[in-house]
A protein has these predicted regions:
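Glycine-rich hexapeptide-repeat left-handed beta-helix
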Residues: 5-24, 34-125
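Short proline/glycine- and basic residue-enriched helix-capping loop/turn segments at helix->loop/beta transitions
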Residues: 31
């Protein structure tokens, strides 16, 4: 899993308007784009959260979900596995192709592998 620049990951607290608050759970091999806000929700495995997307409290993204840039997932919404979602509020746009699912598996591991390159470059200077 990789979290890009400016992303905010947050839980919600227990209080007057939320009996228990909502934890944040992020699965394996997830790419969280720049400036995305992930708030008290569950993100499954092999998801891509687009740049500037917002996911609100108690929302659930099943495995293999691609969320478009700037999309808004409202509280308590469940996004079904294997689809692209876009818009505000996020709506199911179309099924993901096998090539796109393969890209989701590749994306997070690629970004994570870049850290090794940067660490090596930094140690040589």
């Amino acid at each position: 899993t990789n979290v890009q620049d400016g992303a905010v990951l947050h839980v919600s607290h227990q209080g007057k308007f939320s009996d228990r608050g909502h934890p944040l759970s992020i699965g394996e091999d997830v790419t969280i784009g720049h400036r995305a806000v992930i708030h008290g929700c569950t993100v499954g495995n092999y998801c891509l959260i687009g740049i500037g997307a917002i996911i609100m409290d108690n929302a659930v993204l099943e495995d293999y979900v691609m969320l478009g840039a700037g999309a808004l997932v409202p509280p308590n919404k469940r996004l079904e596995s294997g689809y692209l979602y876009v818009g505000s509020p996020a709506k199911q746009s179309r099924p993901l192709s096998e090539n796109e699912k393969e890209f989701l598996r590749y994306s997070a591991s690629h970004y994570a592998s870049l850290k090794n390159v940067y660490l090596k470059e930094g140690s040589e200077s």
